[in-house]
UniProtKB/Swiss-Prot annotation:
It is found in: Cytoplasm, Cytoskeleton. This is Neuron navigator 1. Residues 615-635, 645-655, 698-710, 724-733, 751-773, 1246-1264, 1366-1383 have a biased composition (Polar residues). The modification Phosphoserine is found at residues 90, 142, 152, 194, 199, 296, 308, 312, 362, 391, 452, 474, 476, 490, 528, 541, 648, 750, 754, 760, 797, 808, 1000, 1181, 1265, 1382. Transmembrane segments: none annotated. Interacts with tubulin. Residues 476-486, 503-519, 555-566, 581-591 have a biased composition (Basic and acidic residues). GO terms for biological process: microtubule bundle formation; neuron migration. The modification Omega-N-methylarginine is found at R688. The gene is NAV1. Belongs to the Nav/unc-53 family.
Length: 1877
């Protein structure tokens, strides 16, 4: 990414120089190219004048210019080219300009997005710019690919780009004007510019330098950055003053600095807010220009398009990258970087980025672009990637810094901040979606945005804004230094780190601040960087400082050596810095300077989510995200920062090889991360954004090997990080809090590194290789700078850190110590496992993030689906993870630093944690089970980390932290995650403690945020679970805290990370309302319940499967036993036959021989006694077998128990299974065993099995019996019991035998054998019985468990939908359903169902259960459709229930069967009532139904209780209505086809005034009443008496109406008594519809959208006068009997009546149907007659026949009466009127003839005579006068005669027009309607 970024940057530089083909690219590419050129491309291009590396720096520096709106041209000699580039950029990037952008356009020449480039092209870089084109082409390949068609119009395009940039900026949300004006482009570019043709830029840079405290460094950096820092002089002065104060205050001791910072922040914030409002336009413009593609959400359209383009490269690069980039947009950082396009590059990376960051909104877009750039840069150079990564940080820092002014202005209100927060949140969640997400960001619901951004921004942002403005800058710097130190430290090891850290702050921070910020100084950037300056650019500055410093330092050393590669490193470093800064910022945000931090956050917010993401989120992302997060943002933004920070990046990269790898690799990943970035965006806003991204980053690292895994990729870095971190912690250790802060920063850095390495395992090695060197180089020099910066920043940072660290940092530190030791190992492990892991991650950066997220937030899920499945979740989660990572990283690098700052107890836990983490990391990379604990913890947060970290801290510490957080507010959020986790997770967490600790806050926070987003639900559930595992208390505390702190969007984890934001949010969280929090808490609670219920379901399911296995095994054993029994039976038979043979032989011998006789006699005697003995003994053995139980249940109970016990032993049957069924078993056993089983045992089993197979088991019996023995207690019993029992009989027989002859001995032996075998057989039979019994019981328990699972599913469903049915009803139904199968079952269910609502409920006796619903019983259910009762219109009685039909269901019916039954009934009903299917209703129209008091919603899980209940025979079906955004319920009630109903509603909603005209009796009034009810329901207003006002124009005059409407209009205008204003006015029976339009328009003069709906009806055809018929205010709907809805209404109505009268009368349904079908024919015949012989308004409507009775006899009498008394008189009158008006139009036909011929009932002939004739109208006495009368009539009526057809034609035309637009409208309307509904 970085590589491509760099490339892009160069082309952009080219563009600015006037490169013709880069112009389009310029908006994004400009910044990028500027950055790249600064870093790489600018080196050559800008170096042109200045020379190689120096050149780029100089160019950069030169580019920084302060311009006045007036001095656009002077400012940028190449203004036009710049403009072109800019325009193109904007065009490419942004679709339109905001007002601010337009203002910027005024400065277009100077404002060209390529400010840096433009200046080059214009003056200093004119030539360079031209040369740049080649570079730009070369470098911006990726950029080109991202922003295609941008490159070509380099010069020319740039000018357009400038305007476009404004377009980009245009999004009003980009308060870029100030930022834009103070557009520190890129450090490198600045330097280059200063050398080349500093001209205006140079002047600006010098000014900035002069203004900035760090003049020298800024100067160099200014040259380097040379980004055109277009600063409004006034703004610059103000900002510089503030910044100087901030810087000065930073030099003070931490406390005074903090106080001063707070004051400065407040002042700056006020100033900025004032300037913001004035500059907002210009700022936006500038920002837009600079941000061009990425500027803000405003830039979204363009940004989206460009982003899309960029997304492409990223996408191809990271797979999911592209979408993520867009998601990245969400991360403000990304967005900021995006702006980076021109400004970032000009500012050179950090500053420019930050400028862009200012727009915060563009962040999301910027993020995308930046990411894209990063990705592209990555392509070019891993270093670049890192640079880009750093850029993110820088962006955060710088943009924040620079943008702080804007941001501050922007942060005019916390509401802006919250808005941004929301936007960020939205981005976060939406970013996952892709570039469209970006677009949607602005449109994303505020809640979502708020979720993410607010979460971050809430605490972090507000605090950040308040304190961070200054504090954050300090913090940022501190953290940045720390991070840089960290980065370098990790690369350089402890010494390097601490030194580096320090140096970097001085060198890097100062340098970067000085140079880079110096330019910003014009903007007050340096101050920003320092706390002093932070106020205006609080968010940006800190990040910028940190990121910039790190990047710069790195960039300086590496800038020359590494150039692009180093740039990447720098970016990485910066990013880390940013991360740290973000962290610090968080802390700072928590601090008083909240105003400033907030402003920046607000700025972001103002920009809406993308900016927040950029500003705060970016920082957090960058910092928190560490590599991943940053890279994410970097991906979008870092490219530019890369330019600015190339040198810096180098350091960073070298500092963190792993980081670099992530940079290169991560860039891609980061792209993926961009989605997380969205989350991150939110995170960023909160300052937790970083963490969130970090979470993503960390996740991968954790996944790799927890930290080790990640670290291995960046192993070198980790080592350095560990030591570096340690050192940084001390640096930050002014006090313990400082140390904590530092440790945190270090950890973050480390995490970042980890992240990075993991993020880009493959590139990590390369990057690491180069980075370590670069890092060291950069690290050493930057360390001093950093230290200095740190000193300034530190106090705030410390304060922030104190807060943050107190929670996350302290613990992280302690855990870090342990971790530190382990880090190397982990890293080593990582190297081992990191490779694969990285590969995993690398392949799909997004997936990696997902993995991270999944592993942390959902370890289990992670296991199951590393990448895509969780990706959605993961992105949000990733953000959380990033945050977590930030924390984690801190522990990693904190290990050594942490010991000093953190309590010893914490470290001990951490040691364990590292190990665990190590394992976990490995597991993460590969095994689904990263260790259950790990998984859980991670699940929680990667979340586990948070928990672990906190636990590591030690519960006490956690508590303390919590308390401190609570006090601090902001810290609390950080702590929150920690605290909640530690209690429950102490042990496992401690193992993971360090990382978790660090990560936890982020992860926790992120998860919350994530939860807010799409991921939230899952994550929340997981988090809840994790929390629960960690400790329910913890999770509960965590959640509420998160919610409270961050609003309702922050997850506990999120809260932790967003604690700063949260605090800030508390200060200015106008958006986090208690209600939202409550909702969030409720959601969390419900999610928790859902999770638990899901877990239960899973557990039960697994149990069920286990049971199924058991049952299968049992059945198998039963089969075996059966076969054994058969064998035994066969052997027994064999023995019997042998015995008989023996007897016969003995008898034979007796006869033959006396001895033989004696023997035979003995044998005979023996045989006679043996059977009895055998039987008795058998019983004895039986008894002995079942000894204990035999008394009560005979042997069956005992044997069953013994068998149970033995089987358990033998088969290892699940003890729980048995115990779970214990109660059921005992109860079932009692009755069953005693009765049925013993009987079976004695009778069935023995007999049946004995004879079965006598001969098969002689030998087998012996074998079988042992096995049986082992398997069952009875067989054992036989052994043991037989011992005593056999002996007696045995001995007796033996003695007797001895006394008798030898043959008798043989006989006795045979007898004893037979007896033993028979005993064995008996035992086996008993075993069989027992096993059968057990099998039965198992089946029963399985059934019960199935019921339990069903109940759980139902409960799950209930939880998903809402608080489900009362548990009271649930219990009752459980027994019922269980009773279905058998009393025993119901009993068992009641006993074993721990799930059962209550035993009392399930106390139904078995018999009750059976009687409730016998399995064979059939229940007839009556299905009705119930309409919601509405009493809106007086005297309007409407049917409440519509009978559909009956359905017979069995007593065993379940919900699925019942659903099908209801569907079938409804389908049959519709087919009967509407055979032509014109209504458009189907089973899809059913929303749900209720039986008894249980409601079943079809799209949800069925209720827990089974549907069968005694005495229930009614099912009430509800159809989809307003709540489901459907009109099916209304269609069903009115019988008007669905498309027409939707059309009517759409006309009403669109025009608010409708007149229905048509013959009387066509249902117009009925329809108006229904429409009025619908509108009332849709409005959501309380139904009052006057909500619908009805005027009957027959009874009331037009004057009354006019007076009423005038009063109404006055009432509405005064806005008094609005509640009494009717929503709908019904005008019934208008006599002259034409005049009503004028009357209403004249009287109702209030605003159109406040007017009530007006629906009129008229029986007269509307005369289409010019004033009325086509009048715009009223829409006409003509009802004709010839078309729907009137012509089909009668058929449908009568058929419905027939169905509803379902009774015995309908025995002759066919005849009745024939009669009812005749009625519409009759009506149509009469209608045709009246058309011929009457006037057009004298027609007969279907309502004449609605009173038709159902039943042939009733119908007969009704019809004869109707015909004679109603129809004939009406026809006569109509005919008379027709003759008067038209004369004789046609030959007269008596309608009665047709009626008599077609009478449908059987006895029709008798009734024909009863029907009256219709006599033809007689002219009578007037016949003579009739001709003249006719003539006069004809004379006077030609117009009416002619107009009638014309009218009809016009009406038809209008109707046709309405219908023509209706398909459109319906497709639009449907969504429209649904949306409005």
């Amino acid at each position: 990414m970085l590589g491509s970024s760099v490339k892009s940057v160069q082309p952009e530089v080219e563009l600015s120089s006037g490169g013709g083909d880069e112009g389009a690219d310029e908006p994004r590419g400009a910044g990028r190219k500027a950055a790249a050129a600064d870093g790489r491309g600018m080196l050559p291009k800008r170096a042109k004048a200045p020379g190689g590396g120096g050149g780029m720096a100089k160019a950069s520096a030169a580019e920084l210019k302060v311009f006045k709106s007036g001095s656009v041209d002077s400012r940028v000699p190449g203004g036009p080219p710049a403009s072109n580039l800019r325009k193109q950029k904007s065009l490419t990037n942004l679709s339109f300009l905001t007002d601010s952008e337009k203002k910027l356009q005024l400065y277009e020449p100077e404002w060209s997005d390529d400010m840096a480039k433009a200046p080059k092209g214009l003056g200093k870089v004119g030539s360079k710019g031209r040369e740049a084109p080649l570079m730009s082409k070369t470098l911006s390949k990726s950029e080109h690919s991202l922003f295609q068609a941008k490159g070509s119009p380099a010069g020319g395009a740039k000018t357009p780009l400038a305007p476009l940039a404004p377009n980009l900026g245009k999004p009003s949300r980009i308060p870029r004007g100030p930022y834009a004006e103070v557009k520190p482009l890129s450090k490198a570019p600045e330097a280059a510019v200063s050398e080349d043709g500093k001209s205006d830029d140079e002047l600006l840079s010098s000014k900035a330098k002069a203004q900035k405290s760090s003049g020298p460094v800024p100067s160099a950096k200014g040259q380097e950055e040379r980004a055109f820092l277009k600063v409004d002089p006034e703004l610059v002065v103000t900002v510089l003053g503030d910044l100087e104060q901030l810087l000065f205050s930073q030099m003070l001791d931490p406390e005074s600095q903090r106080k001063r910072t707070v004051q400065n922040v407040l002042d700056l914030r006020q100033n900025l807010e004032e300037t913001m409002s004035s500059l907002r336009g210009s700022q936006v413009t500038h920002s837009s220009l600079e941000m061009t593609c990425y500027d803000s959400d405003d830039a979204n359209p363009r940004s989206v398009s460009s982003l899309s383009n960029r997304s492409s490269p990223l996408s191809w690069r990271y797979g999911q990258s592209s979408p993520r980039l867009q998601a990245g947009d969400a991360p403000s950082v990304g967005g900021s970087c995006r702006s980076e396009g021109t400004p970032a590059w000009y500012m050179h990376g950090e500053r420019a980025h930050y400028s862009h960051t200012m727009p915060m909104r563009s962040p999301s877009k910027l993020s995308h672009i930046s990411r894209l750039e990063l990705v592209e840069s990555l392509d070019s150079d891993e270093v670049d990637l890192k640079s880009g990564y750093m850029s993110d940080s820088d962006l955060m820092g710088k943009t924040m810094t620079e943008d702080d002014d804007i941001t501050t202005g922007w942060d005019e209100s916390s509401s802006i901040s919250s808005g941004l927060s929301d936007a960020s949140d939205n981005l976060s969640s939406e970013e996952f979606n892709a570039s469209s997400s970006l677009n949607s960001l602005p449109s994303t619901p505020t809640a979502s945005r708020r979720n993410s951004t607010i979460v971050l921004r809430t605490d972090s942002e507000k605090r950040s804004l308040a304190e961070s403005g200054l504090s954050w800058f300090s913090e940022s710097e501190e953290k940045a230094p720390k991070k840089l130190e960290y980065d370098s430290g990790s690369l350089k090891m402890e010494p390097g780190t601490s030194k580096w850290r320090r140096e970097r702050p001085e060198s890097c921070d100062d340098s970067s601040k000085g140079g880079e910020l110096k330019k910003p100084i014009s903007l007050g950037h340096p101050g920003s960087l320092k706390k002093g300056k932070t106020p205006p650019v609080a968010v940006t500055s800190p990040i910028t400082h940190t990121a910039q410093s790190a990047l710069k330092v790195a960039g300086k050393p590496e800038g020359k050596a590494t150039d692009k590669g180093k740039l990447a490193v720098k970016n990485t470093g910066l990013q880390r810095s940013s991360s740290d800064a973000g962290r610090d910022r968080l802390s700072d945000a928590k601090k008083p300077p909240s105003g400033i931090a907030r402003p920046s956050t607000s700025g972001s917010f103002g920009y809406k989510k993308p900016p927040p993401a950029t500003g705060t989120a970016t920082v957090m992302q960058t910092g928190g995200s560490a590599t991943l997060s940053k890279i994410q943002k970097s991906s979008g933004i870092p490219v530019k920062p890369v330019n600015g920070r190339k040198t810096s990046l180098d350091v960073s990269n070298s500092a963190e090889p792993g980081f670099l790898a992530p940079g290169a690799r991560s860039n891609i990943q980061y792209r993926s991360l961009p989605r997380p970035a969205k989350s991150s965006s939110m995170s960023v806003t909160g300052g937790r954004g970083g963490p969130r991204p970090v979470s993503s980053s960390i996740d991968p690292s954790l996944l790799s090997t927890k930290q080790g895994g990640l670290t291995p990729s960046r192993l070198k870095e980790p080592t350095k990080v560990a030591s570096g971190r340690t050192t940084p912690a001390p640096v930050n250790q002014t006090d313990r809090e400082k140390e904590k802060a530092k440790a945190k920063a270090v950890a973050l850095d480390s995490d970042n590194i980890s992240l990075k390495s993991i993020g880009s395992p493959e590139s990590t090695p390369k990057n690491q290789a180069s980075h370590p060197t670069a890092t060291k180089l950069a690290e050493l020099p930057p360390t001093p700078l950093r230290a200095t910066a740190k000193s300034f920043v530190k106090p705030p940072s410390l304060a922030n850190l104190d807060k943050v660290n107190s929670n996350s940092l302290d613990l992280p530190s302690s855990s870090d110590t342990t971790h530190a030791s382990k880090v190397p190992d982990l890293h080593a492990t990582s190297s081992a496992s990191g490779g694969p892991l990285p590969s995993c991650f690398t392949p799909s950066p997004a997936p990696i993030l997902n993995i991270n997220s999944a592993s942390f937030s959902q370890g289990l899920e992670l296991m199951s689906g590393f990448s895509v499945p969780k990706e959605t979740r993961m992105y949000p989660k990733l953000s959380g993870l990033h945050r977590s990572m930030e924390s984690l990283q801190m522990p990693m690098s904190l290990p050594s630093a942490f010991p000093s700052s953190t309590p010893v107890p914490t470290p001990p836990a951490p040691p364990a944690a590292p190990t665990e983490e190590e394992t976990e990391e490995l597991t993460w990379s590969g095994s689904p089970r990263a260790g259950q604990l790990d998984s859980n913890q991670r699940d929680r947060n990667t979340l586990p980390k948070k928990g672990l970290r906190y636990q590591l801290q030690s519960q006490e510490e956690t508590k303390e932290r919590r308390h401190s957080h609570t006090i601090g507010g902001l810290p609390e959020s950080d702590d929150q995650s920690e605290l909640p986790s530690p209690p429950a997770l102490p042990m496992s967490l401690s193992a993971k403690g360090q990382l978790t600790n660090i990560v936890s806050p982020t992860a926790a926070t992120t998860p919350r945020i994530t939860r807010s987003n799409s991921i939230p639900t899952h994550e929340a559930a997981f988090e809840l679970y994790s929390g629960s595992q960690m400790g329910s208390t913890l999770s509960l505390a965590e959640r509420p805290k998160g919610m409270i702190r961050s609003g309702s969007f922050r997850d506990p984890t999120d809260d932790v990370h967003g604690s700063v934001l949260s605090l800030a949010s508390s200060a200015s969280s106008t958006y986090s309302s208690a209600e939202e929090r409550m909702q969030s808490e409720q959601i969390r609670k419900l999610r928790r319940e859902l999770e638990s219920s899901q877990e239960k379901v899973a557990t039960l399911t697994s149990q069920l499967s286990a049971n199924a296995n058991l049952v299968a095994a049992f059945e198998q054993s039963l089969v075996n036993m059966t076969s054994r029994l058969r064998h035994l039976a066969e052997t027994a038979e064999e023995k019997d036959t042998e015995l008989l043979d023996l007897r016969e032989t003995i008898d034979f011998l007796k006869k033959k021989n006396s001895e033989a006789q004696a023997v035979i006699q003995g044998a005979l005697n023996a045989s006679e006694t043996t059977p009895k003995e055998l039987r008795i003994k058998r019983q004895n053995s039986s008894d002995s077998i079942s000894s204990l139980n035999s008394i009560t249940s005979h042997s069956s109970i005992g044997s069953s128990k013994d068998a149970d016990a033995k089987k358990k032993k033998k088969k290892s049957w699940v003890y729980e299974l048995r115990s779970s069924f214990n109660k059921a078993f005992s109860i079932k056993k009692g009755p069953k065993s005693a009765s049925s089983y013993s009987d079976i045992e004695e009778i069935a089993t023995p007999d049946s099995s004995a004879p079965s197979s006598p001969k098969l088991q002689h030998g087998s019996t012996e074998t079988a019996s042992p096995s049986i023995k082992s398997s069952t207690s009875s067989s054992v019993g036989t052994d043991v019991t037989e011992g005593p029992a056999h002996p007696a009989p045995h001995t007796r027989l033996f003695h007797a035998n001895e006394e008798e002859e030898p043959e008798k001995k043989e006989v006795s032996e045979l007898r004893s054998e037979l007896w033993e075998k028979e005993m064995k057989l008996t035992d086996i039979r008993l075993e069989a019985l027992n096993s059968a019994h057990q099998l039965d019981q198992l089946r029963e328990t399985m059934h019960n468990m199935q019921l339990e699972v069903d109940l759980l599913k139902a409960e799950n469903d209930r939880l998903k939908v809402a608080p489900g049915p009362s548990s009271g009803s649930t219990p009752g139904q459980v027994p019922g359903s269980s009773a279905l199968s058998s009393p025993r079952r119901s009993l068992g269910l009641a006993l074993t169902h721990s799930f059962g609502p209550s035993l009392a409920d399930t106390d139904l006796s078995p018999m009750d259960g059976i009687s409730t619903c016998g399995p064979k019983e059939e229940v007839t259910l009556r299905v009705v459709v119930r309409m919601p009762p509405q009493h809106i219109i007086k005297g309007d009685l409407k049917q409440q229930e519509f009978f559909l039909g009956c359905s017979k269901v069995s007593g065993k019916v379940d919900w699925k069967m019942l659903d099908e039954a209801v569907f079938q009934v409804f389908k049959d009903y519709i087919s009967k009532m509407d055979p032509a299917s014109t209504l458009g209703l189907s089973t899809e129209s059913i929303h749900g139904y209720s039986i008894s008091h249980v409601k079943r919603v079809l799209d949800a899980e069925p209720p827990e209780m089974p549907p069968c209940r005694r005495g229930v025979n009614n099912i009430s079906v509800s159809l989809k209505g307003l709540k489901e955004k459907c009109v099916d319920s209304l269609v069903f009630e009115t019988l008007i086809p669905k498309p027409m109903m939707q059309h009517y509603i759409s006309l009403l909603l669109k025009h608010r005034r409708l007149v229905l005209s048509g013959p009387s009796g066509t249902g117009k009034t009925y329809l108006t009443n229904r429409l009025a009810e619908y509108l009332v329901e849709r409005s959501g207003r309380e139904v009052t008496e006057g909500i619908v006002s009805t005027f009957n124009m027959h009874q009331q005059s037009c004057k009354d109406l006019q007076l009423y409407l005038s009063n109404l209009a006055n009432q509405i205008d005064r806005e008094t008594g609005i509640g009494d204003v009717p929503l709908v006015i019904l005008l019934d029976d208008l006599s002259e519809a034409g005049s009503i339009s004028e009357l209403v328009n004249g009287a109702l003069t209030c605003k159109y959208h406040k007017c009530p709906y007006i629906i009129g009806t008229t029986n007269q055809p509307v005369k289409m006068t010019p004033n009325h018929g086509l009048h715009l205010s009223f829409r006409m709907l003509t009802f004709s009997n010839n078309v729907e809805p009137a012509n089909g209404f009668l058929v449908r109505y009568l058929r419905r009546k027939l169905v509803e009268s379902d009774s015995d009368i309908n025995a002759n349904k066919e005849e009745l149907l024939r009669v009812l079908d005749w009625v519409p024919k009759l009506w149509y015949h009469l209608h045709t007659f009246l058309e011929k012989h009457s006037t057009s308004d004298f027609l007969i409507g279907p309502c004449f026949f609605l009173s038709c009775p159902i039943g042939i006899e009733d119908f007969r009498t009704w019809f004869i009466d109707l015909w004679n008394n109603s129809i004939i008189p009406y026809l006569q009158e109509g005919a008379k009127d027709g003759i008067k008006v038209h004369g004789q139009k046609a030959a007269w036909e008596d309608p009665v003839e047709w009626v008599r011929d077609t009478l449908p009932w059987p006895s029709a002939q008798q009734d024909q005579s009863k029907l009256y004739h219709l006599p033809p109208p007689t002219v009578g006495p007037h016949s003579i006068a009739s001709p003249p009368e006719d003539r006069t009539v004809k004379d006077s009526t030609p117009s009416s005669l002619d107009s009638d057809p014309l009218m009809a034609m016009l009406l038809k035309l209008q109707e046709a027009a309405n219908y023509i637009e209706s398909p459109d409208r319906e497709t639009i309307l449907d969504p429209n309607l649904q949306a409005t509904l």
